[in-house]
Amino acid sequence: MQTRTRPLTTSLAARRAVPGPALYGEPMHGTTPRKLDPAGAQALLSQLFEPGADRLAHSIGVGRRAEEVARVLGSPDLLVSAAYLHDIGYAAVARDTGLHQLDGARYLSGLGAPPELTGLVAHHTEATVEAAERGLDGALRREFPEPSDELLDLLTYCDMTTSARGEAVTVDERFERIYDRYPPSHLVSRSMREAEPRLRRLVSGIERRLGPPPR
């Protein structure tokens, strides 16, 4: 598999020089996930986020929601792995540009993850909107072509129906909590308001296939 090379900031290069977990081909928690594997994704999460952290709880909740969706629709393990790893760009070892979708996809690419996975992580939940706000939309599209609409929509659905603490919520509740957390002038709040109509349509369409999330 070809490996992308790109300049790293000094701080990021230093962080990545510290030995860390590998998703493919090296032991993690006593396992060696040599292919796309939701169990390996969960093991990586547990190494990169502190126990009890909101980001860990949210990622686990999104992963479990994806497992439910995959059972109903017959979706592949790729969806579940991407769901567990979708916010890995918030981990200290991965943070670089501030666009967590791009940072997470780059980090996973460096671990040898396949482009099918990195593309989902890179583009989940209307990433191109925030990327444009940050001047990173060109880099995002060049490095990670947008993946299949079906899996990307399902991943985004799982994210938008899971709270910051990993609980199942409605899309109304999800937006309400996002806007409570970020003031109107914040980049995240602005990006989500721009993306909100599309995200609501996406969630509504998938809920017609699945039914509303469990409460």
What kind of region is each of these model predictions?
Residues 76-104, 108, 118-128:
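His-Asp-centered metal-binding catalytic motifs of divalent-metal-dependent phosphohydrolases/nucleases
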